[in-house]
Amino acid sequence: MRLLAAALLLLLLALCASRVDGSKCKCSRKGPKIRYSDVKKLEMKPKYPHCEEKMVIVTTKSMSRYRGQEHCLHPKLQSTKRFIKWYNAWNEKRRVYEE
């Protein structure tokens, strides 16, 4: 009986630990250096209950050196703020030439 109770307790602890890992913010570290021309999509996701800041997710083109990977950039870093500012300006300029 004690063995069964111990096994259930360990199972409960394992479930709680897996939920804690899944509730962390994705953007905790600085991402790789990405060029504006390599970006396919830039997403800014709002704050979630488990994450205190917004998430900035960059999807690269399949022909770039990162080959279509998604990278999460830390929103509070100055480099990320500059990247968003300059990417939006670059994207607007590119749109004018495409139309």
UniProtKB/Swiss-Prot annotation:
Residue numbers covered by motif D-box: 55-69
Distribution of this protein across tissues and organs: Highly expressed in brain, lung, ovary, muscle and in kidney and liver parenchyma, and at lower levels in bone marrow.
PTM characteristics: Ubiquitinated, followed by degradation by the proteasome.
Annotated GO CC locations: extracellular space
UniProt-annotated location(s): Secreted
Keywords per UniProt: Cytokine, Disulfide bond, Secreted, Signal, Ubl conjugation
GO biological process terms held by the UniProt record: immune response; inner ear development; negative regulation of myoblast differentiation; positive regulation of natural killer cell chemotaxis
First and last residue of the signal peptide: 1-22
A Pfam family it matches: IL8
GO molecular function: chemokine activity
Disulfide linkage: C25-C51, C27-C72
Domain of life: Eukaryota
Domain comment, as recorded: The destruction box (D-box) acts as a recognition signal for degradation via the ubiquitin-proteasome pathway.
Family assignment from sequence similarity: Belongs to the intercrine alpha (chemokine CxC) family.
Function according to Swiss-Prot or TrEMBL: Chemotactic for CESS B-cells and THP-1 monocytes, but not T-cells.
Protein name per Swiss-Prot or TrEMBL: C-X-C motif chemokine 14
Gene that encodes it: Cxcl14
